[in-house]
């Protein structure tokens, strides 16, 4: 990055020069037929359908520049959208990004966000097809993700049936642990906190654990863990008209327990209600072998709601934008 770009503000460089800079040298994914530079982008829809998802991140609510680098923020913005697309059984193809920022925002901040977005988009199998850049009072990021079902049926939350095995791919609780470290004022350079901080700043959805089993090991229902395991399983159970019982013993994580002990916190609550891990959780017929990377954590039963070892959870179950998440939410980020 040039010294000029490190000292310039968005006002000084200008909207169109900044757009040119953050798009220079980028290579589009195969499904993006026409990227930035025209009135709109052009994406291929090989089987005539798109999976589409949108999320918005607001500075001070969903991220803080004193807690995360611009590149980390960009990666997180794409990851949470890509995870939604993959959870529907689609391969991410393209992303459209809208960014609002104050005029005195350093150009390097916008460049860092763009670099992070591109890195995660490529990791997910897509690219940034276009977007918008506007003036706003604070940093605001909106991402719309597109995905290709490849001729397969969409995976939804509504297909779980009684007797299904509930299984998860990816880590649980680590993002909440990282948020707890940042919120507590603990020493972020302590190696004991490194993995938790990375999990919160740059979630790593296990895309391959879903994409690689398309058409081979198909779950009856699937969702990603964004609001919290119990909350997201609650959405799945309600959509399917079933109940889900989670087995606490299947969710223990001794390494996360160490982090929680340092903060005098409850790792179990992070795992059950923390959210933002962007793991995937689904239900599978007991006659179907779980694919690699998936582990059983519970069972689908008759009834409604979610229980843990047969009992209704007493604490917070996850995040809700206008209510927060009780002890699992910290002022300034979520």
Give residue spans per PLM region.
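Glycine/charged-rich beta-loop-alpha catalytic/anionic-binding loops adjacent to active sites
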Residues: 25, 58-67, 148-149, 190-196, ...
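Glycine-rich anion-binding loops of enzyme active sites
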Residues: 45, 57, 92-180
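N-terminal glycine-rich phosphate/pyrophosphate-binding loops that anchor nucleotide-derived ligands
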Residues: 1-86, 331-333
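Active-site glycine-rich loop that binds ribose-phosphate moieties when present
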Residues: 144-155, 162, 192-214
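Glycine-/charge-enriched secondary-structure boundary and capping motifs
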Residues: 2-24, 68, 102-127, 134-141, ...
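Residue-level signal for inorganic ion chemistry
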Residues: 42, 81, 89, 128, ...
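Short, compositionally biased
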Residues: 176-194
């Amino acid at each position: 990055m040039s010294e000029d770009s490190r000292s310039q503000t968005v006002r000084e460089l200008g909207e169109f020069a900044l757009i040119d800079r953050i798009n220079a040298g980028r290579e589009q994914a195969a499904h993006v037929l026409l990227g930035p530079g025209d009135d709109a982008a052009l994406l291929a829809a090989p089987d005539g359908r798109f999976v589409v998802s949108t999320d918005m991140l607001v500075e001070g609510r969903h991220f803080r520049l004193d807690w995360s680098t611009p590149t980390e923020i960009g990666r997180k913005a794409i990851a949470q959208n890509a995870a939604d697309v993959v959870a529907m059984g689609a391969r991410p193809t393209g992303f459209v990004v809208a960014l609002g920022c104050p005029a005195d925002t350093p150009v390097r901040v916008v460049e860092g966000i763009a670099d992070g977005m591109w890195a995660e988009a490529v990791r997910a199998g897509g690219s940034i097809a276009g977007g918008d850049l506007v003036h706003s009072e604070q940093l605001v990021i909106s991402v719309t993700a597109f995905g290709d079902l490849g001729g397969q049926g969409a995976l939804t939350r509504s297909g779980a049936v009684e007797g299904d095995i509930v299984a998860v791919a990816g880590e649980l609780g680590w993002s909440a642990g990282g948020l707890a470290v940042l919120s507590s004022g603990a020493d972020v350079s302590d190696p004991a906190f490194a993995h938790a901080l990375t999990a919160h700043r740059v979630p790593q959805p296990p895309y391959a654990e879903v994409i690689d089993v398309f058409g081979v090991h198909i779950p009856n229902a699937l969702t990603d863990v964004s609001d919290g395991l119990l909350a997201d399983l609650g959405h799945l159970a309600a959509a399917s008209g079933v109940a889900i019982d989670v087995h606490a013993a299947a969710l223990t994580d001794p390494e996360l327990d160490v982090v929680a002990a340092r903060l005098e916190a409850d790792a179990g609550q992070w795992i059950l209600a923390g959210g933002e891990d962007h793991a995937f959780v689904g239900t599978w017929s007991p006659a179907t072998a779980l694919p690699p990377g998936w582990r059983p954590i519970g069972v689908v039963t008759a009834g409604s709601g979610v229980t843990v070892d047969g009992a209704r959870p007493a604490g917070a179950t996850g995040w809700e934008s206008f209510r927060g998440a009780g002890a699992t939410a910290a002022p300034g980020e979520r």
